[in-house]
Swiss-Prot record:
The keyword Transferase does not apply. Its main location: membrane. The chain crosses the membrane at residues 18-38, 53-73, 91-111, 145-165, 167-187, 227-247, 257-277, 281-301, 305-325, 344-364, 367-387. Keywords: Cell inner membrane, Cell membrane, Lipid transport, Membrane, Transmembrane, Transmembrane helix, Transport. GO terms for cellular component: plasma membrane. It is a multi-pass membrane protein. It is found in: Cell inner membrane. It comes from Shigella sonnei (strain Ss046). Pfam families: MFS_1. This is Lysophospholipid transporter LplT.
């Protein structure tokens, strides 16, 4: 890849537009497919405890392929890696449409998502640089948030109309992402000719994990972000069961509206953190993390829709204020120790492992018959205690 290609590309070049459109459609499909498939499980009378299993097979793919996907992204043109990954997502969504086991289809989507993640972030640095790179990351995050909001709501609303229509819309979104990927210029591979010895690749990845874990600051960041995203995905599934019990509403759309309030709140909280927190004042974000658990506890006791909306937006605000500085800390310290790509891969492993653990505990609680409101209360209390313990540990070290 020539220097001119790397540095002189406009922020709104054809390639950058293609990346942003592909990211929006791919993330739209991910979020719509989750709620469409949950509606399918409900329509086919799967047990309630099976709902979080759906997300567990998705994140399981992330964990299984974590040591390898970074090298895949660096060994081939990233635009083509993204196209292949979206093709896997399309295949998974289409298989669910055609009646293949939804857990198998969703696993395929998870494999595609695992391959897609390092490529979508890595390609930004190949299409632009400097101050434009910061803006490009902002565009990527903005398109992702928009896709989360619109995709979640679309999945629930379309599923209330017809589950098959919702699933078909997800497949179309992935198909559109594949088409958008075609318009990304075929840049040279970042690190071609690497060894594909799986043992060596795994050993290298584990060395990066060990290096980050031994550093107090990066360990603190990894634990904090993992707790947050593990709790966030568990809250998504908690809402699906909580809404009919606490609010008496049985449609598929209402949980998606409530999830959208969390996403909006995260945007607000992230903006506040950017203005009020620096790497030197990291401790300012910790009270917000504790308050997430407290507000989840209060939210679980609600029986009216408007207070539920307000409290979930507040949870999102606290979440954005908490997690954005932790991400920045890991990126800054990780870049200097193991490289940004390895740091992101290790972070993905930590976050998805936390999701797997928390979803497993939640699924077990539902399976043994614990009512959803006490689950929510316990969930909020435990999260607040966990972040408090993390803060105490950070202050001592």
């Amino acid at each position: 890849m020539s220097e001119s290609v790397h540095t002189n590309t406009s922020l709104w070049s054809k390639g950058m537009k293609a990346v942003i459109v592909a990211q929006f459609l791919s993330a739209f499909g991910d979020n719509a497919l989750l709620f469409a498939t949950l509606a399918l499980l409900k329509a086919q009378f799967y047990p309630e405890w099976s709902q979080p299993i759906l997300q567990m097979v998705f994140v399981g793919a992330y964990i299984l392929f974590a040591p390898f996907v970074g090298q895949v992204a660096d060994s081939f043109a990233k635009g083509r890696v993204m196209m292949f990954a979206n093709g896997l997502k399309l295949l998974g969504a289409a298989s669910i449409c055609f009646g293949i086991n939804p857990f198998l289809g969703y696993t395929l989507v998870g494999v595609g998502a695992a391959a897609y993640s390092p490529a979508k972030y890595g390609i930004l640095g190949e299409l632009t640089t400097g101050s434009k790179l910061v803006k490009a990351n902002g565009l990527m995050e903005a398109s992702t948030i928009a896709a989360i909001l619109l995709g979640s709501v679309a999945g629930g609303v379309l599923a209330d109309w017809h589950v098959l229509v919702a699933l078909a819309a997800c497949a179309l979104a992935y198909g559109g992402a594949v088409v958008a990927n075609i318009y990304i210029p075929k840049l040279a591979a970042a690190r071609p000719g690497q060894s594909w010895n799986l043992i060596n690749m795994t050993r290298s990845f584990l060395n990066a994990c060990t290096s980050l874990w031994r550093n107090g600051e990066t360990r603190f960041s990894l634990v904090g972000t993992s707790l947050f995203w593990g709790a966030g995905v568990t809250l998504r599934f908690l809402l699906v069961l909580w809404v009919p019990v606490a609010l008496g509403i049985t449609d598929n759309a209402t949980p998606t509206y409530l999830n959208a309030m969390v996403a909006i709140g995260i945007v607000v909280g992230a903006g506040a953190a950017a203005k009020l927190v620096t790497l030197e004042t990291m401790s300012r974000c910790m009270p917000a993390g504790i308050l997430i658990g407290v507000v989840v506890l209060i939210f679980s006791l609600q029986h009216e829709l408007l207070p539920a909306y307000a409290l979930l937006m507040l949870i999102g605000v606290m979440g954005g204020f908490f997690v954005v500085p932790l991400n920045a800390l890991l990126q800054e310290r990780g870049k200097k120790s193991v490289g940004a790509g390895n740091a992101i891969a290790v972070q993905n492993l930590g976050e998805n492992s936390a999701m797997l653990l928390m979803l497993g505990i939640y699924s077990l609680a539902v399976m043994v018959g614990i009512p959803v409101v006490p689950i929510g209360i316990g969930f909020g209390a435990l999260f607040a205690l966990a972040i408090t313990a993390l803060w105490i540990w950070q202050r001592r070290h």
